[in-house]
Amino acid sequence: MLRIIFLLSLLFALSNDSVQDFCVANLKRAETPAGYPCIRPIHVKASDFVFSLGTPGNTTNIISAAVTPGFVAQFPALNGLGISTARLDLAPKGVIPMHTHPGASEVLFVLDGSITAGFISSANSVYVQTLKPGQVMVFPQGLLHFQINAGKTPAAALVTFSSASPGLQILDFALFANTLSTELVSATTFLPPATVKTLKGVLGGTG
């Protein structure tokens, strides 16, 4: 009998997605591996399903670029849907540094300007393309990729992800904005210690 109850409970859990139209996240509760708990449907409003990416981000920073996320933490209606979005703004010479999204593939749609984008495969093959407004490029899950403003005017793009929480790790920050000792970073990157110290100083790392 206990085995039957367990199997029925498991079946209900696995089929939960098919019996709920949506699950707007209750951000006051803790996130679980399955996402956030749902707000009760009677408390959900039409405005919960709307999010704005119409305002350009502030590009006055070290990378001359801005990312405005529309992940589940900002757009709770995405909870459980397996998708998310963001806006990229790049000033002239702006760059989204080499980075990965461990939890999602990415599709980039150029709105304005010219963006050179690319990724590196697990076989170290490089795929680079300069994109114009209206063009789209895909970046497979977990692969290193980047975007650079290739023009002399501001550029903007929308990106979508195959997860509500795609994750983000920027390579430069992972290497140099941490507390790992200069000696270890130097030994594992083959960079001179002086270069490592300089990069740590620029990006806020120590050690």
Curated annotation (Swiss-Prot):
Family: Belongs to the germin family.
Pfam families named in the record: Cupin_1 (PF00190)
Residues at which Mn(2+) binds: H99, H101, E106, H145
Signal peptide: 1-17
Domain Cupin type-1 residue range list: 51-197
Summary of subunit composition and partner proteins: Oligomer (believed to be a pentamer but probably hexamer).
The organism of origin for this protein: Brassica napus (Rape)
Compartmental location: Secreted, Extracellular space, Apoplast
Disulfide bonds, paired cysteine numbers: C23-C38
Annotated GO CC locations: apoplast
Keyword Transmembrane: no
Protein's UniProt name: Germin-like protein 1
Record: glycosylation sites: N58
GO MF, any single term: manganese ion binding
Task of the protein: May play a role in plant defense. Probably has no oxalate oxidase activity even if the active site is conserved.
InterPro entries (alphabetical): Cupin_1, Germin, Germin_Mn-BS, RmlC-like_jellyroll, RmlC_Cupin_sf
Claim: RNA-binding is one of the keywords in the record: no
Gene3D superfamilies, A to Z: Jelly Rolls
